[in-house]
């Protein structure tokens, strides 16, 4: 296949900035996936100060990357509180992988539920899980004559894991703002779920530095890092390389392309652009449009049920 002029330029760009063949930008993470706006530092303080108001913690992670989407700093802050982990977006994650994660958490003494907060699937198990996790608190309240006292949970997680969708489902009213982009909820809010459960919603918060570049990659793949601070073309190339190594059949089936084995990300992106007819003046590939399609369709689960990490 003859690579187009623009394809050739993009290939050079990719080699320099993505592969580190020229010592200008040594790795993907340092250039594209580091995002910690000022309000997140404030959020960390608010979470720490609010812990004495709750009995337990609900952490929402992305079922496709449970480890990478769990903020280690939040984990350290809330470790003394009973915790429930919601593996959200499990509808687009590999079900076998999700089952392994649930078993993993169980061995750690943590209750984990596979859910889809937008549709509500799996959330019928949430209230019983709350009462099971805080059975000792319920018993103490009853002995003190406060059997009707609500159990309070703080809801935490990184941006774009589905906290607002969860709150809306459980509160029964569309009170929390829902948008498929990182960094929407910006203040602590209380919501009642009924059944004696109250939830304290908190804004999504990342941590200042991703020590493992692959963690930064994965967070950008699922949209937990704002697209406006990433290079979407470079990001899509990296995503395609990861998926080509693990799920090549899904790429070929979704985009009606073949022979991607051994190709670099930009080459696969070019194939996708041609097949989809993403062209600009002169018949050149519109890489920006192709990149947006790849990232959006992965996030929406249109390539199939994919998990990017196992316990």
Task: Locate predicted features.
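Structural beta-sheet core signal
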Residues: 59, 85-87, 155
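N-terminal amphipathic/basic-hydrophobic helices that include classical n-h-c signal peptides
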Residues: 1-21
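Short, structured loop/turn "capping" segments at alpha-beta junctions
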Residues: 137-141, 168, 174-180, 246-251
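Glycine-rich phosphate-binding P-loop
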Residues: 153-172, 202
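Helix-rich effector regions associated with P-loop NTPase G domains
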Residues: 19-56, 64-73, 77-83, 90, ...
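Canonical P-loop GTPase G-domain recognition
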Residues: 93-152
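Short coil/loop residues immediately preceding or within conserved phosphate-binding loops
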Residues: 148-150, 173, 188
């Amino acid at each position: 296949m003859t690579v187009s002029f623009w394809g050739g330029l993009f290939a050079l760009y990719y080699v320099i900035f993505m592969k580190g063949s020229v010592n200008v930008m040594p790795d993907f993470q340092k250039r594209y996936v580091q995002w910690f706006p000022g309000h997140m530092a404030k959020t960390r303080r608010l979470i720490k100060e609010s812990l004495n108001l709750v009995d337990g913690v609900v952490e929402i992670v992305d079922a496709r990357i449970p480890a990478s989407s769990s903020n280690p700093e939040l984990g350290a802050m809330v470790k003394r509180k009973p915790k429930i982990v919601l593996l959200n977006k499990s509808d687009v994650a590999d079900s076998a992988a999700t089952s392994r994660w649930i078993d993993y958490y169980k061995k750690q003494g943590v209750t984990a539920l596979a859910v889809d907060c937008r549709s509500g699937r799996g959330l019928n198990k949430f209230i019983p899980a709350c009462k099971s996790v805080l059975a000792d608190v319920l018993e103490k309240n009853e002995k003190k004559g406060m059997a009707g006292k609500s159990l309070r949970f703080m809801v935490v997680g990184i941006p774009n894991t589905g906290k607002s969708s969860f709150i809306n489902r459980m509160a029964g009213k569309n009170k929390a703002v829902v948008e498929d982009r990182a960094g929407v909820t910006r203040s602590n809010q209380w919501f009642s779920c009924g059944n004696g459960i109250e939830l304290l919603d908190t804004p999504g918060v990342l941590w200042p530095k991703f020590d493992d570049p692959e963690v930064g990659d994965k967070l950008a793949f699922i949209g937990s890092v704002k697209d406006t601070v990433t290079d979407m073309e470079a990001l899509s190339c990296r995503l395609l390389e990861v998926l080509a190594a693990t799920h090549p059949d899904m790429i070929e089936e979704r985009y009606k392309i073949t022979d991607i084995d051994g190709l670099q990300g930009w080459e696969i992106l070019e194939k996708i652009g041609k097949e989809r007819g993403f062209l600009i003046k002169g018949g050149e590939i519109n890489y920006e449009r192709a990149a947006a399609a790849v990232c959006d369709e992965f996030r929406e689960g249109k390539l199939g049920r994919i998990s990017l990490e196992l316990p």
